[in-house]
């Protein structure tokens, strides 16, 4: 098990997949980082040499905003939008979808479970 950017990456996974355990690194960034570090995509994490791990860690730390920094930046962006009172900030404050999705039906994930209203029945 290797540790990159404060995250334990399972040793039995391919490096390409293992790097996606880090917040802020998806499949595409993973491939870019491996290419820059000169590591094959098919290599298993347990088979990486110390030199390869050092090169990979250095590239990821210097090139990408990941883990705590990324989470902090996203949280501050949301906080700023809420404070200035823009439309997206209002949607965040109310716990509704932010990016223009419909809410007449669906949006249950953000709205939470249904609250039944007493005395409201469907007209026939």
From Swiss-Prot:
Gene3D superfamilies: 1.10.8.50, 30s ribosomal protein s13, domain 2 (4.10.910.10). The keyword Manganese does not apply. Keywords: Ribonucleoprotein, Ribosomal protein, RNA-binding, rRNA-binding, tRNA-binding. SUPFAM superfamilies: S13-like H2TH domain (SSF46946). GO terms for molecular function: rRNA binding; structural constituent of ribosome; tRNA binding. One of its GO terms (cellular component) is cytosol. It comes from the Bacteria. Residues 111-124 have a biased composition (Basic residues). The keyword Chloroplast does not apply. GO terms for biological process: translation. Residues 100-109 have a biased composition (Polar residues). InterPro entries: Rbsml_uS13_C (IPR027437), Ribosomal_uS13 (IPR001892), Ribosomal_uS13-like_H2TH (IPR010979), Ribosomal_uS13_bac-type (IPR019980), Ribosomal_uS13_CS (IPR018269). Coiled coil: none annotated. Residues 95-124 are annotated as: Disordered. Part of the 30S ribosomal subunit. Forms a loose heterodimer with protein S19. Forms two bridges to the 50S subunit in the 70S ribosome. Belongs to the universal ribosomal protein uS13 family. HAMAP family: Ribosomal_uS13. Located at the top of the head of the 30S subunit, it contacts several helices of the 16S rRNA. In the 70S ribosome it contacts the 23S rRNA (bridge B1a) and protein L5 of the 50S subunit (bridge B1b), connecting the 2 subunits; these bridges are implicated in subunit movement. Contacts the tRNAs in the A and P-sites. This is Small ribosomal subunit protein uS13. It comes from Tropheryma whipplei (strain Twist) (Whipple's bacillus). The lineage of its organism: Bacteria, Bacillati, Actinomycetota, Actinomycetes, Micrococcales.
